[in-house]
Amino acid sequence: MLIITAPGQGAQTPGFLAPWLEVPGVAERLGAASELAGCDLIRYGTTADADEIRDTAIAQPLLVAAALAAAGALAGGAHADAAAGHSVGELAAGVLAGVLSADDAMRLVRVRGAAMAAAAAAEPTGMTAVLGGDEETVLAAIARHGLTPANINAAGQIVAAGAIADLAAFAADPPAGARLRPLQVAGAFHTRYMAPAVAALRDAAAEVAVTDPYLTLLCNADGAAVTTGKEWLERIVAQVAAPVRWDLCLRTMADLGVTAIIELPPAGTLTGLARRALPGVAQLALKTPDQLAAARDLIEEHLSESDGPGHGHLPEWRLIVAPTSGTFRSPAGRFDATATGAMVALTSELGTVVTRGGERSLATPWPAEIIEWLVEDGDPVSEGQPLVRVQPREGV
């Protein structure tokens, strides 16, 4: 059984995207993502320095766009049994599992990053990594100082978060046997200090159309697999102000019988945690395109052959529905709204729904074949109305 994972904030390093621009289609995907994110992700991923990409409002869109671009080069989430993301990486995992489109993921991460940055600026807060020590002792010390265990990543890796003054007191009175390392982040993410960001993200999420995952999709709140797109979206919103339990995600991977893990770029953090928590499980940190062949080999070796739901097999067909009411417009220069048999790549635009306030794009979360259009260019459509039937395909 194979799982694809997407890392969270802090994994980015200067220039990590540069080699990926040589892969056909990646620059175009990143260019489109940049428009949705409102910033030049190609520049931030290639020539920007560490301070620039540390900015929460930049780092979060950069991470999601990078993971999705690499997934597209790998042929998408169709080649996995399960998906999981750490913190903001959950948005990329949702796309791989077919819950939402890449465009909607970029719209959400733009709001998420900006809202979390604004919440962090409201009060002087921060985060400190706690390495080693007895877990119960560490958690008791964190609570004693009024802090929150914002990330419990694995045995011996917990991140405390809260007010700067409380973190200073914690540093002066550390748990026995533990080492403390202050993190260079803007604020106390995944704590109550992020409540304003939850409200902003909830408003943005109300505009997103979701479908149920066709992969086993793990969530950070408790490591559990979600079965509906609605539940996943609710969890994604709440997670901004709730601790990340990656340790429980790792436990679920073990319970599921995961035999291989591929981490999307900027890779290394999650495979490092898995190496200690899941000994014997094959891991590949996909850092450069040179590793794509090895990743495909790992997929071929470990992909489950089960025919049950949630085992990574593509659904027979899916409906793409209107995200809002308005007028449907087919994409100029690609194929008209009556065409069938057209093959579209992961995240390719299928058209737009135009409203008085703007337009919403349609995209498929999978590489797919157009089976049947249910509307024509210029038709009025209602929110939730089926627009097109598609057959997900591998390797489009």
Range-by-range predicted roles:
Residues 282-305:
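Short, flexible loop segments at boundaries between secondary-structure elements
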Residues 307-361, 367:
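Acidic, low-complexity mobile loops and tails
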Residues 337, 374-375:
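Exposed loop and linker-edge segments at protein-protein interfaces
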Residues 349, 355, 386, 392-393:
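Short, surface-exposed secondary-structure boundary micro-motifs
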